[in-house]
Amino acid sequence: MLASLIGGIFGTKNERELKRMRKIVEQINALEPTISALSDADLSAKTPEFKQRYNNGESLDKLLPEAFAVCREAAKRVMGMRHYDVQLIGGITLHEGKIAEMRTGEGKTLMGTLACYLNALSGEGVHVITVNDYLAQRDAELNRPLFEFLGLSIGTIYSMQEPAEKAAAYLADITYGTNNEFGFDYLRDNMVFSLAEKKQRGLHYAIIDEVDSILIDEARTPLIISGQSEDSSHLYTAINTIPPKLRPQKEEKVADGGHFWIDEKQRSVEMTEIGYETVEQELIQMGLLAEGESLYSATNLNLVHHVSAAIRAHFLFQRDVHYIIHDGEVVIVDEHTGRTMPGRRWSEGLHQAVEAKEGLAIQPENQTLATTTFQNYFRLYKKLSGMTGTADTEAAEMKEIYGLDVVIIPTHRPMIRNDQNDLIYLNRNGKYNAIIQEIMNIRQQGVAPILIGTATIEASEILSSKLKQAGIHHEVLNAKQHEREADIIAQAGSPNAVTIATNMAGRGTDIILGGNWKAKLAKLENPTPEDEARLKAQWEQDHEDVLQAGGLHIIGSERHESRRIDNQLRGRAGRQGDPGVSRFYLSLEDDLMRIFAGDRVVAMMRAMGLKEDEAIEHKMVSRSIENAQRKVEARNFDIRKNLLKYDDVNNEQRKIIYSQRDEILAENTLQEYVEEMHREVMQAMIANFIPPESIHDQWDVEGLENALRIDLGIELPVQEWLEQDRRLDEEGLVERISDEVIARYRQRRAQMGDESAAMLERHFVLNSLDRHWKDHLAAMDYLRQGIHLRGYAQKNPEQEYKKEAFNLFVNMLGVIKTDVVTDLSRVHIPTPEELAEMEAQQQQQAEAMKLSFEHDDVDGLTGEVTASQEALNDSATEQQTFPVPESRNAPCPCGSGLKYKQCHGKI
């Protein structure tokens, strides 16, 4: 009430922003006559002039009016398109590091060229980030003539790209690519063995297309680069036989003989007591569990991991909804966009469990080598902006997490689309039949094109089957028709066209009423001017016919969890002032209604005695649906915030490690760095045998001499020194031993020569850093899985996580230094040939490393057991079984033949 009163007096924040920006637009428009009078050569010459002025200290803000006027004039000459005033406002919004919400069809791609051009003048590079490779390639090629006319270079990055080509793309003034590729390149750049192998040159300015999809929908799923771990396919195959013998419990707190409880909201499962006993008996019969042994003993947690993954695969993940089978492989379907995600795999053994369920070849599990989240990656940019048709519903989250304001850009022409009330049916069959009947009614009335939005591939195929039975020609656009996507969308506005699309979010192509005559022309082998004239004339007639029929009709077959994605579907109609109609058809069996809408609504509708083909429109039901969506949005926001709290801790550690790595790669010699490591390791080693501030009787001098001999291969007469100098205290001893160890290292270094020594140092430091960072990521993942249990002890899980993570990090740094010092002390002096071979192997390892790129499952926050937990628990248990040797480099007492530090002493 108060907010609306203040807004009525002073105007809303958005109105004030638009008023300020319109003054800048007036300045740009005032320059148009002058800029229009320039020749092509003079117009192109403006770019080097602007760059020089920027280098001389003039700010981009000061250059903006003139630069925007130049970009608009160039677009008019090269592309035949002139930026509208509202697009200029959008360009200013992007330049100022904000989100521009612009309705579908208002020209976001053209709007983005303004901010790209202005910010490219700094010479630090602009990244334009899209949701898929097709859009990145399309937008780059569409804008290439404009930017090249203005003297700017343009590049595109994509997966499996040649390294030299990708490096060149990053060096361009403007680089197009997907959010996944930019994120993975950042991680890959921090796994290289030389600075020359790095591709990204810095994160200066980014414009994110469909910013809500990338920063909101995909923010929940961390980016992971992982490598293959040991093969356990036999376990997946064996345990896959268990879930069909189990049945779910209907209610969480009511025991009804069920074996497990499903939490659909969290996509997790929890076994009941009966479930534990049943699974234990099955495992005993298979010989995977010893008689009388508990499934939850520390040594059997790997079995819990496999059983949990198998149950989730059978009961939570459905074929043609969450994944499809393509060429004998399980391919994930993005629930937000309906696109397949080839090469991506679920983690926590879930992907292998699904492969076992489908009877496919089981690929090995993956171990995390590097990880980050989109939230933290995009916050690394000095300036970030975005554009979308729907962001206002998530404006609070954009501001809280990314510090981005949302500016709603007015439309060039008024919106006249007719958004009709939802119709709610008793079940899905009744809903689908009503949709078919509505399509037939629309077709009887005229030639209006129809777009049907579905939430899953399964729903699209059911509707497709019913349309075939009704004899209605139609196109289907889902993950299975990815290759034909552009063609299908291009003609979805043609007269009488019926198109079924799974999750229209992020499709990125406008639906033009009457169809796309240019797309038809492009399909002809040798088009003539007559062909062009004929197709254009036909389109003009079709366009007019479709307008008279009421424009594009949108039929939503289900409400999405997010109001924003519903709005994206609606937004396909009514572009640039065109007419259009939209309506959603719902049923009580829809997931949103079933899980979130509440039993009261369902009970009320059943009590009304509705028949299958009857629908209701009721304010209470509509409110319940909207409240359900708000609940889901709030829950997802909480999940993202929670993920960010924990990843912020990881992020600080990641930045330290990556910064340290860059310093190591940049240094010609690491001698000073390695010598400092020697001092720190000596101090820690001596403290183990000579406790700080202790008396001589507590000193274990013999143990210290043995450790120096075993770990470093150095014989030092420490006892003799103490006898000769009674005043030698703990501090003096640390200094004397460190000096002696460093002196001997310098002798070995001199024997190797500076060049060979520098290479050997870099090799050992990077290998140790990467190896232990990888193990640290697994330990951090395990820590996060179980940290919620600290809440039962009246402790704050977040604070406990920070404390434990810090201890793990400090411990990791100590182990890295110890490994480097011991390896450098004991390695034999290599020949030049051995050094060359070592370098070649390292390079080969970097290039041949089999990496897979995943989106991690956010359900990890709920505390499920994971592979990393299994490994750590096994390790912890076995450490208690065997005695700890005097040195970490001594053979492991378990008899494996490995060093203790590589076996049961592994941290």
UniProtKB/Swiss-Prot annotation:
The keyword Lyase belongs to this UniProt entry's keyword annotation: no
One GO BP on record is: protein transport by the Sec complex
Q: How does it sit in the membrane?
A: Peripheral membrane protein
Q: How is the cofactor bound?
A: May bind 1 zinc ion per subunit.
The entry's localization annotation reads:
Cell inner membrane; Cytoplasm
Out of the domains of life, which is the source?
Answer: Bacteria
Which chemical reaction does it catalyze? ATP + H2O + cellular proteinSide 1 = ADP + phosphate + cellular proteinSide 2
Q: What is its EC number?
A: 7.4.2.8
Any idea which GO molecular function terms this record carries? ATP binding; metal ion binding; protein-exporting ATPase activity
Q: Which cofactor does it need?
A: Zn(2+)
Q: Fetch the CDD domains from UniProt.
A: DEXDc_SecA, SF2_C_secA
Residues at which ATP binds: 87, 105-109, 510
Q: Which residues bind Zn(2+)?
A: 892, 894, 903-904
Gene Ontology CC annotations of this record: cell envelope Sec protein transport complex; cytosol; plasma membrane
Provide this UniProt record's keywords sorted from A to Z.
Answer: ATP-binding, Cell inner membrane, Cell membrane, Cytoplasm, Membrane, Metal-binding, Nucleotide-binding, Protein transport, Translocase, Translocation, Transport, Zinc
SUPFAM superfamilies in the record = Helical scaffold and wing domains of SecA, P-loop containing nucleoside triphosphate hydrolases, Pre-protein crosslinking domain of SecA
Task performed by this protein: Part of the Sec protein translocase complex. Interacts with the SecYEG preprotein conducting channel. Has a central role in coupling the hydrolysis of ATP to the transfer of proteins into and across the cell membrane, serving both as a receptor for the preprotein-SecB complex and as an ATP-driven molecular motor driving the stepwise translocation of polypeptide chains across the membrane.
PANTHER family, alphabetized: CHLOROPLAST PROTEIN-TRANSPORTING ATPASE (PTHR30612:SF0), SECA INNER MEMBRANE COMPONENT OF SEC PROTEIN SECRETION SYSTEM (PTHR30612)
NCBIfam families per the UniProt record, alphabetical: PRK12904.1, secA
Q: Which family does it belong to?
A: Belongs to the SecA family.
Q: How does it assemble?
A: Monomer and homodimer. Part of the essential Sec protein translocation apparatus which comprises SecA, SecYEG and auxiliary proteins SecDF-YajC and YidC.
Per its UniProt record, what HAMAP family does this chain match?
SecA
Q: What is this protein called?
A: Protein translocase subunit SecA
Source species: Acinetobacter baumannii (strain ACICU)
